[in-house]
Amino acid sequence: RYSSYYGSTTKSYLAQTADGGYQRAEYINDKIVVETYDSKRNLVSSKNVEAELPIFGGIYIGKDYNYAVFGQMNKEESDECEVFRFVKYDKNWNRLVQCSVKGANTYIPFDAGGLSMTETDGKLYIHTCHEMYQSDDGYHHQANCSFVVNEEDMTLVDSYTGVMNLGEGYV
């Protein structure tokens, strides 16, 4: 029997470090808990990184930097409301700079889906989902959205937050 199943963002991440150890980052109680382990799996360090907005999107442990994505609801459907924040950290999780996205046809960020990131050629690619502004049928439909951010200065290079496949549904 089918019962409303929704996707959600991943809260726990694990990556191997250059020295053969591991770094674990997990979103718990409005903060990112970062633990570093040596190659024998002994805890070397632990750090808490405060969430910057109320809704957690995801983490990316990159080659030279780490990234976290946060968001917040936009109940007024205001194009001036910050709905996504992409934050760049150094490899020790010290905050460096952010990229803010406002409006973006977003009522609720990350709703009913996940978030994935990758990097290549100095660009950070973020693919996630959102519940969009109310449509003519009176509903807030869910859809995918994508962003490309320049890693050096964290400027937004490209984004897509519109409605796809109008004739077939929302994807």
Identify the residue ranges that each predicted region occupies:
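Entry beta-strands of beta-propeller and related beta-repeat scaffolds
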Residues: D19-R24, D64-V69, G122-H127
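Short, solvent-exposed loop/turn segments at conserved positions within beta-propeller repeat blades
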Residues: E26-D30, E76-E82, Q134-A143
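Blade-loop segments of beta-propeller domains
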Residues: L43-K75, E82, S100-N105
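Beta-strand-rich domains and repeat architectures in extracellular enzymes and scaffolds
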Residues: R1-I32, A51-L53
